């Protein structure tokens, strides 16, 4: 079956458009201009032959000839424009190879960013005709006949689902058709998954393939977080009750004690390809070449060609037999930077191939990076932004706001976060619940939630200061991987959350400063969350608070029934 583009729906009454001034159908317009072109051309050719026979100068033209020339030019422009656009569209939409590349090609940016969009308004003017209920016959009756035919072809396997956006030219319509096809194939109800109210064109080829809707997540605000003299209202997307409230209490304690201070220790994204050499000796020669400071300027020049923001910082190598793992680190501006550093690494590998033709590149990523996996190299060397955030909480705030005392908090941190994590053999997990805050902020601001693995590496330290009266608390997070451009940051909801923090988009005056500021806000949020949860544990309030905010008897009754 051939999937055809459907003409756009007519505008609602009262809305005047420019096309309303043309009462003729497009086929009649094409016929008129084609006839005008043929008639004008025939007339001018006849007059040209007559002038040649009578030796009349060709540049002498009458009114009729001028009108014919005007008609010829006007009709030619119209026909070239009309058929030229149709020709280009047919080329773009007819290549099956390009459709395959679109399906399996590498994702751009942070592909797993969640689409946290607001629910559609009750009286939305553009409601979906494909409601997705297996028992809703009325929905099927309202479905256009052409869409019904396409759905049937997708279900039968005649039309691949992944080509719908390309063939139809309407991302919203493609999502609706795919959704209905999935409903019929599975026989499952999905009407609870919203379809309308989301810009599907914004994720095409960038954030998510084969969309059928979007997931709604509530976004809460914790704050103000007083950090480095600025007040931030921190957006957190979560379904865990008590999390935002607890973080908010931590923010209050920090603000009433004068605020927190942060420092960015390092800023560099990494990528580590792995290459195999004929012998271990040969691999060692390549290792020495890469780590020799004499060659760094040349490698840096080759690497930095990938982007005007990419700046190679260093290369760290490790060997396993004759396999060489090369960990490149570079500054990536306000982008999280995985694509940027990967392009730079590819440039260097191509350059090295000239001097080391026996080098066999196994993979652009050899897991020495290390991305989306807990790894000692990230814990020790850092990846992304390495941040330390600290605050001194006054004694009266500990008692009045946190409902505990300094000594109990210090003792709990040692026994739980330090000794307990050591007993568990934790890697980067010397904290109470840093991952909770990191993930909630990541989802709200369009980061890659999977990078919560290394971004949540954190060690929380508590000490009694000022003769034991006040509490010094700090979090050290060596690998916060965030960006303010690319990936899910361009989605409307996530961009709004970034704008709330004042870090939306790239900073033109100081490239990279927006991403670094976002990393410090994440660390500040973790500081607040750690302070509040440890206080709840020390005071024995954890179970009570979760029973109040994280559990509902009404919801439980639904589950039981």
Curated annotation (Swiss-Prot):
The keyword NADP applies. It is an enzyme of class 1 (oxidoreductase). It is found in: Endoplasmic reticulum membrane. Its EC number is 1.1.1.34. The chain crosses the membrane at residues 25-45, 69-89. Keywords: Endoplasmic reticulum, Glycoprotein, Isoprene biosynthesis, Membrane, NADP, Oxidoreductase, Transmembrane, Transmembrane helix. Pfam families: HMG-CoA_red. Residues 90-145 are annotated as: Linker. It comes from the Eukaryota. Glycans are attached at residues 304, 550. InterPro entries: HMG_CoA_Rdtase (IPR002202), HMG_CoA_Rdtase_cat_sf (IPR023074), HMG_CoA_Rdtase_CS (IPR023076), HMG_CoA_Rdtase_eu_arc (IPR004554), HMG_CoA_Rdtase_N (IPR023282), HMG_CoA_Rdtase_NAD(P)-bd_sf (IPR009023), HMG_CoA_Rdtase_sub-bd_dom_sf (IPR009029). It catalyses: (R)-mevalonate + 2 NADP(+) + CoA = (3S)-3-hydroxy-3-methylglutaryl-CoA + 2 NADPH + 2 H(+). GO terms for molecular function: hydroxymethylglutaryl-CoA reductase (NADPH) activity. Belongs to the HMG-CoA reductase family. This is 3-hydroxy-3-methylglutaryl-coenzyme A reductase 3.
